[in-house]
């Protein structure tokens, strides 16, 4: 249980994990255990760990994480004064409002994972809400931009129909809290038609978790930049 207090939890493929021994679990339930119970893969599916990493790759993964999560505080730079010029895009002409809406919904527009891969020099995706599952429509993790470690949280439209489940909001909350504890700026990439409206989501507290996510984001002790990359 103590290992579950880690900021980032990594397991080797096929590793046995869990609180109670398999025999005790089976005796308590009186039912045969599902295949793969108490394995790293099962815990990953249910949002309990961040990564499954082969032993041969552990050294590189851990070294990248240490580099990203334990950067020395940057010295304060001399404040720059002046106005930021509004960027201009060559070949772009502002058209009717509906054309802009269609452009924002273009099927070939870059996704959150595309932006993350282009923005960061190194990036480690973190998985799971530590409660129920891992919503793939929310992609998040720590990366570095121009030698500055940041927490990136994006809505990935190519997964789960781009609709966010309660587990996705809880994962976002977890990453926000981790960023706050480590003093990392947060960048969010927004692109979604809305939260998943199914009954199962309601039963897992979608209304509550959306409200608490907004409350948390509005009271963070670190800077947060939100970038709208779609709808």
What are these regions (language model features)?
Residues 1-74, 190-231:
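Conserved catalytic cores of soluble enzyme domains
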Residues 59-150, 154-161:
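Intrinsically disordered, low-complexity segments enriched in small/flexible residues
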Residues 29-32, 118-123, 129-132, 166-167, ...:
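A short linear-motif detector with a strong N-terminal bias
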Residues 18-19, 36-37, 113, 120-123, ...:
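Aromatic-residue hotspot detector
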Residues 4, 38, 110-114, 138, ...:
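Charged, alpha-helix-enriched surfaces in structured cytosolic catalytic cores
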Residues 21, 34, 38, 54, ...:
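Alpha-helix initiation/capping motif
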Residues 1, 141-218, 224-227:
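Cleft-lining beta-strand/loop regions that shape enzyme active-site pockets
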Residues 7, 87-90, 184:
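A generic hydrophobic-helix recognition signal that picks specific residues
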């Amino acid at each position: 249980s103590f290992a579950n207090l880690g900021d980032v939890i990594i397991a080797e493929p096929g590793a046995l994990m869990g609180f109670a021994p398999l025999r005790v679990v089976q005796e308590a339930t009186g039912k045969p255990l599902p295949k793969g119970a108490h394995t790293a893969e099962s815990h990953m599916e249910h949002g309990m760990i961040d990564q499954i990493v082969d032993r041969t790759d552990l050294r590189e993964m851990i070294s990248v994480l240490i580099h990203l999560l334990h950067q020395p505080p940057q010295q304060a730079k001399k404040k720059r004064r002046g106005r930021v010029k509004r960027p201009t895009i060559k070949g772009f002409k502002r058209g009717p409002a509906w054309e802009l809406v269609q452009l924002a919904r273009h099927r070939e527009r870059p996704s959150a994972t595309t932006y993350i891969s282009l923005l960061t020099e190194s990036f480690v995706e973190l998985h799971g809400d530590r409660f129920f599952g891992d919503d793939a429509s929310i992609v998040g993790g720590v990366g570095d931009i121009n030698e500055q470690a940041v927490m990136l949280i994006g809505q990935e439209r190519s997964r789960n129909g781009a609709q966010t489940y309660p587990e996705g909001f809880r994962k976002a909350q977890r990453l926000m809290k981790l960023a706050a504890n480590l003093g990392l700026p947060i960048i969010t990439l927004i692109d979604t038609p809305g939260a998943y409206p199914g009954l199962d989501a309601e039963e897992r507290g979608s209304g509550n978790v959306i409200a608490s996510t907004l409350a948390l984001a509005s009271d963070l002790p670190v800077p947060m930049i939100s970038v709208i990359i779609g709808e």
